[in-house]
Amino acid sequence: MSDVETFAFQAEINQLLSLIINTFYSNKEIFLRELISNSSDALDKIRFESLTDKSKLDGQPELFIHIIPDKANNTLTIIDSGIGMTKADLVNNLGTIARSGTKEFMEALAAGADVSMIGQFGVGFYSAYLVAEKVVVTTKHNDDEQYVWESQAGGSFTVTRDTSGENLGRGTKMVLYLKEDQLEYLEERRLKDLIKKHSEFISYPISLWVEKTIEKEISDDEEEEEKKDEEGKVEEVDEEKEKEEKKKKKVKEVSNEWSLVNKQKPIWMRKPEEITKEEYAAFYKSLTNDWEEHLAVKHFSVEGQLEFKAVLFVPKRAPFDLFDTKKKPNNIKLYVRRVFIMDNCDELIPEYLSFVKGIVDSEDLPLNISRETLQQNKILKVIRKNLVKKCVELFFEIAENKEDYNKFYEAFSKNLKLGIHEDSQNRAKFAELLRYHSTKSGDEMTSLKDYVTRMKEGQNDIYYITGESKKAVENSPFLEKLKKKGYEVLYMVDAIDEYSIGQLKEFEGKKLVSATKEGLKLDESEDEKKKQEELKEKFEGLCKVMKDVLGDKVEKVIVSDRVVDSPCCLVTGEYGWTANMERIMKAQALRDSSMAGYMSSKKTMEINPENSIMDELRKRADADKNDKSVKDLVLLLFETALLTSGFSLEEPNTFGNRIHRMLKLGLSIDEESGDADADMPALEDPEADAEGSKMEEVD
């Protein structure tokens, strides 16, 4: 061997290794899945390169994965004829945490980067140390000599040019020196089970070096000759008996051979009716590395002008980073005529369906397709359209089973709502899949379709209210009149509802109307209309006084027909943001604050003329327009209405002081001085009054 070079692991790798050795995975068996997966990636890469340059396969024309357990030396060896690694790859990728995965490789290749190994091993490689105390990696890349990497995970590793070992031709050989307590991974049965469990659907042959014992019948004198030599003496026996024994003599012969473990042809090439639920589950797990089974599967083929086969899975739970845009989703693998081309192919499926996993195998795409040409590819656009259509069908199939759909909806309702926001073609379909709690649904959730069937006679609109939580909206003042009249109101309490409902606008010809915005019109009898007019007249004076006190805090103050019990509420404009949307936008750290100016619409204060507080306030205001307590009460009512209507307070301290003053009044505590009122502006301000009158005229 030539000179040995020693390199220190990067600090994070050391941490990672101690993490892996101590806590990383409890089920150590996954190391084999990870290493086979790495081999499969390396084979994908060389196959991809060979599509444009056949000579790349000269070093080793066969593509395979070999596994050799050696009980004599307690080693497990994994050999693949993949792309291999150069010396630089070895140092970089097995010394620092590398970016694993075909995606970066494809992108770099498309960008004209050097096609030598780019990040073959991710964290998966280090999982070898779950079972091994020492790992030796021998590797040969087309562009470099053969090198050996070795480490006992003690903070450093060595790299040496391999002059003594066998020539690999091309590829990588990993020898794992197993720990004393991990020798089960040398057992043929255990290894076969593991490969079947995790790597059954790897598209390259995985062969295991197995012992085979065969019984041979020996009828000649060979056996006897051997015995004679060994014992040095011959027993005299009956001739006949000897002949008889010679005929029957059986001897066990032990030999080794390769045994192919993954005999299945790709699952998507088989007929759906032939495939069992267990086979789909095994395929899903090998595809996604999920430890749970899938929730639903759709296996179909499209024929005609365009041919492709696909298997799509919906997982049981959403990944914790579902909406993490920085992380590349590993969702749909793209094959062309059984040749793996790339994973996480963004162009195959819209972002809002990124939770759907699966594979697509096209007969029509060119084999040398790159990410750049993908975007312009017409075939891919048709495939994408078909996939979305099939996903929608799959969701409707899940919806037939209530229990399954509840699981699905809990995990992926945000995606459906995002679909409504982004996909105008399928908007109506997605709307059918929505489920909401409502004033009449109890603990169950209701669909828009069911809501429509329960609509009252003469009801033309679907009513909804948005808010922070079900608890927050259940007793909202906005619902009082609607409940009294027996209308059902949907609770939309997911932040994304604000966006999706902004796009949906209607369902089956019925307009979606917010209970918290202007323009809520409820059917009224002639008597009710007449009564309303009288009350408007009666309270006109109070409305003006309140507008003067509140100034530009509100656009106008009017007599309400939507509140029944509460004294008042604050309503937003029909096309502006609701209180809930305002809250959501304020919570966004990187928001564009210029937009808030014109989208957070002016509030209208609606007062309830039948509420005793309002009636008393009217009497006081009529008696003395400048009554100090009227002003205090109006401001207090406004601030309380802000809270009950879902807005946030601009000045919580002032509100607190007002409440404290009311408490003192209630407890008959005298104010010691007028200091407490000093911060309250005077009620009568001639300029403000004039301004207020102008506003009235505008209104």
From Swiss-Prot:
- On the tree of life, the source organism's domain of life is Eukaryota
Expression by tissue, per the entry, reads: Most abundantly expressed in roots and apical shoots. Low expression in mature leaves.
Q: State where composition is biased (Acidic residues).
A: 219-228, 672-690
Sequence motif TPR repeat-binding, residues: 695-699
Show the SMART domains listed in the entry: HATPase_c
Induction of its expression:
Heat treatment increases expression 3-fold in mature leaves. Has little effect on developing shoot apices.
- BP-aspect Gene Ontology terms: cellular response to heat; protein folding; protein stabilization
Name by which UniProt lists this protein: Heat shock cognate protein 80
* Organism listed in the record: Solanum lycopersicum (Tomato)
What gene does the UniProt entry assign to this protein? HSC80
